[in-house]
Amino acid sequence: MEVLDFEAVRAIVAETPDSELIRWVDEALREKSGYTLPPKIHIAQQDGDYYNVMPCIYERGNIAMVKMIGRHSIKRGEDRSSMMGDILLYESDTGILRALMDGEYITTLRTGISAAHSARLFTRPDFETVGLIGLGNIMTVCIRAFIASLRAEGDRRDVTLKLIRYHGHQQRIMDLFREDPNVHFVLCDTYEEVIGGSDLVFAANIYGRAAVPDTPYRHSREKYFI
C-alpha cells in the first residue's frame, strides 16, 4: 500500500502540465456513465462544521474509492487548514487497499480545474476580460489552468484579468503570469468593479453571486458566472 501525503500529491501535480489536468477532468466527465456514484453523505456538526463522505466504483478501471472530507473551525493554538480530507483507493474486484492519499490538495485541484474546464466549454468564444472574485488556492489553480489551456492550443489572445484588492492576494495571481506579456491586470476596489465589463466571472468564495446582491450584474445574461 502506498501512502501519499499532501507534499507527495503536490509534487506529482507540479510535474503535470495544467492542460493535461484539464484533459483528465474532460475524460472523467465523458466516462461518467461508467462510474457508480451513490449520493454524497453529509454529516452536520455544531457551528457549521461537517463531514462529507463520497464513495465511488469505476469497474472498467478496477478501482473503488472513498473520499472523506471535513470542514472544522480552527481552534486556538492550532496550525492546520480548516478543510482537510483523505482518500482510500482499493482494487474493486478484491477489496485490497492500494493507497491512502491526502485529499485536501486533490479537492482544491479538482474544484479549480473543473471550473476552468467549464469556462472553456461555455463562455463566449471571443472573451477578452475575466473577473476574479476570491483569490485563494482554488482561484489560483483555476485561472492558471484556464490560461494554460488557451496557450496549449496556440491561442495567444490578450486577456485582461480584473482582480479585487484584498490583503495583497492579488499579487499572487499577478505573479502567475509574469512571463506572459498577453495577460493584463486591472485592480478593483469593489465586486461591482470586478464584474462590470467582464465577459466571464469566476467566483471562488462562499458568497458567489450573492457577493453583489444589489447590482444589475447578478443575473446578467451577457456574462458567464462560475
PLM feature segments, named:
Residues L135-G136:
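Glycine-rich Rossmann-fold phosphate-binding loop(s) that bind the pyrophosphate
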Residues M1-T108, S114-A116, D126:
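N-terminal ligand-binding/catalytic initiation module
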